């Protein structure tokens, strides 16, 4: 008897642009490209533009009436891979991305049956765009926070584009995607899917023994 094939891996991309759903967004575009690479590897993908939700300030899993975070958190918990896509503003990630990290911080105290924080075993990717410097710092900040919360970071798990200094061309205005960006995006997606499958088949050991 052959065992049933495991379900496909899944990914959710949180688009942390400051622009609403109807506005073109470079953060949305680079996330789409990353999700496209994940889909080509058999990963089921979804994306959410966070600015269209009411993500209330705070560090609790549910901040009460009017908070859309619990529904979004449920999607993050059900996915194997989290993609954080953010623009660069004044050299930093967007305020929306920072809000997401603050809300995820509550998950440190939510443990599974083996005493592991709920996000342990999930994989995180970062995508950053901007026409100013800052991508490396933003990726470092994102990965420090996400790893602290419990996410695993794959090898070369980020993709980014920064335009020339003192000019106003956005990523979505380019005639074509630079080869270096496309190659980096493909590698990040490939490595994330690989790591997610490894962690699904061989989870991290328990943090605490049975009572």
Show where each model-derived region lies.
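N-terminal beta1-alpha1-beta2 submodule of the flavodoxin-like/Rossmannoid cofactor-binding fold
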Residues: 1-114, 172-211
